UniProtKB/Swiss-Prot annotation:
Gene label: rlmH
Top-level taxon: Bacteria
Subcellular location: Cytoplasm
InterPro entries: Alpha/beta_knot_MTases, RasGAP_dom, RlmH-like, tRNA_m1G_MTases_N
Molecular function GO labels: rRNA (pseudouridine-N3-)-methyltransferase activity
Naturally occurring in which organism (per UniProt): Prochlorococcus marinus (strain MIT 9515)
Membership in a protein family: Belongs to the RNA methyltransferase RlmH family.
Binding site for S-adenosyl-L-methionine: L56, G85, L104, S105, P106, L107, T108, F109
EC number(s) given by UniProt: 2.1.1.177
SUPFAM superfamilies assigned: alpha/beta knot
Principal location listed in the UniProt entry: cytoplasm
Record protein name field: Ribosomal RNA large subunit methyltransferase H
Reactions listed under catalytic activity: pseudouridine(1915) in 23S rRNA + S-adenosyl-L-methionine = N(3)-methylpseudouridine(1915) in 23S rRNA + S-adenosyl-L-homocysteine + H(+)
Amino acid sequence: MLKANRLSIYAIGKIKKKWIREGINQYKKRMPDLIINESKSFNIDNIRVNNIIICLTEEGKSFSSTELTSLLLNFKNKKINFLIGDADGIPSDIKDKSHLLLSLSPLTFPHELARLILVEQIYRVISISNGSPYHRA
């Protein structure tokens, strides 16, 4: 079973669009233990060495929601950190240190919308791992 307290999102910049912030807040109410850090830059040294780092990037690998669930469950009890860049993406030196490059879709999304989609997918993955009816494949 996957729990929100093992998952963190590190994102560059603050969300400016109210409707996106409201959407994220709706999912945060369902997952109060999910950590979302917004800052001006990534400090990868602050992420513990034994944590899993997943960078969201357009050149990453895509998974179905059930495949992503299986992948994250394979990380056992490790903390999982998702990194989302700004409009310029994630610097290559940080991508090189990640465990996985993840693409949410072959489509390109604005970084703020990608954050909302990621939060929804995290909720979906947790629901799948818990046997909740939220995900109806």
